[in-house]
Regions:
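Residues that define the transmembrane beta-barrel architecture of outer-membrane proteins
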Residues: 39-45, 84-88, 138-144, 187-191
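Outer-membrane beta-barrel translocator domains and adjoining extracellular loop/strand segments
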Residues: 32-38, 73-79, 117-125, 170-177, ...
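Bacterial Sec-dependent N-terminal signal peptides
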Residues: 1-23, 195, 209
Length: 209
């Protein structure tokens, strides 16, 4: 009973301050500046929570805490393989309320890498995991993002977003890195689709359309 009361005391002020909610969806991620290899999108997931302070104006804001699995598939002259990366992401967006049902998001994000896996497959079909793959990647990432979000009814939301990383994915062009690059200027792009639910009453926008 005490735990329930404590949870109510913690959550209620958040509800009065703004809308909190949950969201989950799919990631389609890839890399850029990789002329030495062929690469393709890798599908992952995103799941997390958000806080959107209440606002009746056209401009509002939204902060999220997201667990995001992303990466890419690659192909060289001799091997192909995958890279899987797991991040904790902290995006913050400026929300433009076109109507009470439709928002445009523009903002930035930071991310911290908590796990990394990579492998390579030879022409013979044998797959070799990369030992201690985390050592090759930069832990911190940052970039810009933008997208749209629809609020069709009640607490439901559906959205899409594009994130462009400004940080190098790899620390350096280290020997033994899989796949290997002549330059470390490799960056990530991430396209997300998601759905979610926000709790608390949605404030009416000054734009009543």
């Amino acid at each position: 009973m005490k735990k329930i009361v404590l949870c109510i005391l913690v959550v209620y002020p958040l509800l009065s301050f703004g809308q909190i909610g949950v969201k989950a969806g799919l990631n389609f991620s890839n890399v850029t500046n990789t002329s030495s290899i062929s690469h393709s999108n890798r599908t992952g997931y995103n799941i997390g929570i958000f806080l959107a302070p209440k606002s009746k104006s056209i401009i509002s804001s939204k902060t999220e805490l997201i667990l995001s699995k992303q990466g890419y598939n690659y192909l060289t002259n001799s091997v192909d393989g995958t890279a899987d990366l797991l991040y904790i992401m902290l995006p913050t967006y400026l929300c433009i309320n076109i109507t009470r049902f439709f928002q445009i998001h523009i903002g930035a994000q930071m991310a911290y890498l908590i796990n990394a896996k990579a492998d390579s497959k030879t022409a013979s079909g044998s797959t070799s995991p990369v030992s201690d793959a985390m050592q090759y990647y930069n832990r911190f990432d940052y970039g810009l993002g933008g997208g749209v979000e629809i609020h069709p009814f009640k607490g439901l939301l559906v959205g899409t977003r594009m994130n462009i990383s400004l940080a190098n994915l790899y620390k350096d062009a280290a020997s033994g890195q899989v796949p290997s690059f002549a330059s470390v200027n490799v960056k990530q792009n991430l396209f997300q689709i998601y759905t979610g639910w926000h709790f608390g009453k949605q404030p009416a926008s000054s734009n009543k359309k």
